[in-house]
UniProtKB/Swiss-Prot annotation:
Interacts with BRCA1 and RELA. Positive regulator of Th1-type cytokine gene expression. It is found in: Nucleus. GO terms for cellular component: nuclear membrane; nucleoplasm; nucleus. This is PHD finger protein 11. One of its GO terms (molecular function) is zinc ion binding. A zinc finger (PHD-type) spans 108-160.
Length: 331
């Protein structure tokens, strides 16, 4: 329930007025102590069934804002406030935080409908898929929640298929919706399996200056295989590759991002065959474009010839009409 904000100074009455005393007392208190953030109020759709997830809305009358409960819970940049009343089962979202999340969503496009306002992101650190909550469900993304611990998160369809990722997302408590802010910078708590894999990677980096040959890389891959993390490692690599097109198409991509992507693609021997095939594709497209240009050139010549012929017909008709007029006048 929204609480009244303190009376403003210009509305304070005379000093002797009983209405003025609460206002004066309020003004004497520090602003941070007295002011309470306005909360979203719970509403239930009277025409929806009671057991459906979309019948619960939260509404802020002062800002004319309404949002589904799940859209609020699963939004990546939004958390609930400290609950002032533990007996109140309603969610505790303050209006200003919701407005900031709406503003953040204006920069994010939904992977499913391609419209802005997509504040629900895949929980995997390197995945940049964003959705509207109900679009995510249509795209077979998997919401995961623990109401007791206040954890609400979502995995896209691709990453929900892999047990290690799904397990780590299910039990890591990084996206709490009650009691603490959630980082947007990607500081995820890592499960033991991921930490083990990262330790291997760090060891490879430390050894890179001294051993750049297969004596380090081969054992690393074998250890990943023994630990059951080889698929996870490859999925991380694929996630990085899958994120490249979206980054390149984004108008806000920085020059350093272009340099990083270019280095990853052109300096990696893994893609040598890919570039050979890509060169062949370029030659094929050049040939197709040349053929199309030749066809267009022939079509243009035909149209110009047709235009000239039509002009000749028009000139002949005008001459005939003029001759007929002169003949009629001579009589």
């Amino acid at each position: 329930m929204a609480q009244a904000s303190p009376p403003r100074p210009e509305r304070v009455l005379g000093a002797s007025s009983p209405e003025a005393r609460p206002a004066q007392e309020a003004l004497l208190l520090p602003t941070g102590v007295f002011q309470v953030a306005e909360k979203m109020e719970k509403r239930t759709c009277a025409l929806c069934p009671k057991d459906v997830e979309y019948n619960v809305l939260y509404f802020a009358q002062s800002e004319n804002i309404a949002a589904h409960e799940n859209c609020l819970l699963y939004s990546s940049g939004l958390v609930e406030c400290e609950d002032q009343d533990p007996l109140n089962p309603d969610r505790s979202f303050d209006v200003e935080s919701v407005k900031k999340e709406i503003q953040r969503g204006r920069k994010l496009k939904c992977k499913f409908c391609h419209k802005r306002g997509a504040t629900v992101g895949c929980d995997l650190k390197n995945c940049n898929k964003n959705y509207h909550f109900f679009c995510a469900k249509k795209d077979d993304a998997v919401p995961q929640s623990d109401g007791v611990r206040g954890i609400y998160k979502l995995l896209c369809q691709q990453h929900a298929q892999f047990p290690i990722i799904a397990q780590s997302a299910k039990f890591s408590g990084v996206k709490r919706k009650r009691g603490r802010k959630k980082p947007l910078s990607g500081n995820h708590v890592q499960p033991p399996e991921t930490m083990k894999c990262n330790t291997f990677i760090r060891q490879v980096k430390e050894e890179h200056g001294r051993h750049t040959d297969a004596t380090v890389k081969v054992p690393f891959l074998k250890k990943c295989k023994e630990a059951g993390l080889l698929n996870y490692l490859l999925e991380e690599i694929l996630d990085k590759v899958h994120s490249i097109p979206e980054k390149l198409m984004d108008e806000t991509t920085s020059e350093s991002d272009y340099e990083e992507i270019g280095s990853a693609l052109f300096d990696c021997r893994l893609f040598e065959d890919t570039f050979v095939n890509f060169q062949a594709a370029i030659e094929k497209k050049i040939h197709a474009s040349q053929q199309r240009w030749q066809q267009l050139k022939e079509e243009i010549e035909l149209l110009q010839d047709l235009k000239q012929t039509l002009c000749s017909f028009q000139e002949n008709r005008d001459l005939m009409s003029s001759s007929t007029s002169i003949s009629s006048l001579s009589y």
